[in-house]
Amino acid sequence: SVFMTDQGISMTKYSLLWTLNGVLIVIIQLIITWINRYRSNLYLQVFLGLFTVGFSFVLLLFAKSYIWFVLAMTVLTIGEATAFPTMPAIVNELSPVNIKGKYQGILNAFSSLGKAIGPLFGGILIELSSYRILFVVCAVAVFVTLAIVFIVVKANQSRTVHY
């Protein structure tokens, strides 16, 4: 919100972005559920979702007017609603029955860790540099994560056991 208000955008418009986020999550989840009835590829969903999240940070590099923030939030929400709900499904598919809970717990622990450390890291990065650097670091981090996930999935695809 500070970045947007520094650009002269009102808090009301900022709040509307979160309303847009919520509405889009519901709509996108309905669409994904419908698509998955006919064709489901969980890994493709994660790949596309992560790419889209990374791209949203690239868009923020150009955000000078409200429409850019709307576009970045829309792209972020598409990625968020595509990738993140899929990860527990993949963990469930790859985990033996007797230890599914353990692996779901590990996934949730790392998710919580990111939510705890992310704002602190972001705040420090903004204080030491700028929002622009933060957006570049976030985009690079997401794209590097995407590349690692893609390489690991492809390297282990032939010997992966689905439960």
State what each model feature region is.
Residues 1-17:
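Short amphipathic helix-loop junctions that connect adjacent transmembrane helices
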Residues 11-12, 97-107:
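Loop-to-transmembrane helix entry/capping segments in MFS-fold secondary transporters
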Residues 28-41, 126:
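Helix-to-loop junctions at the C-terminal end of transmembrane segments
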Residues 61-73:
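Helix-loop junctions at membrane interfaces in 12-TM secondary transporters
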Residues 82-95:
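Intracellular juxtamembrane helix-capping segments at the cytosolic ends
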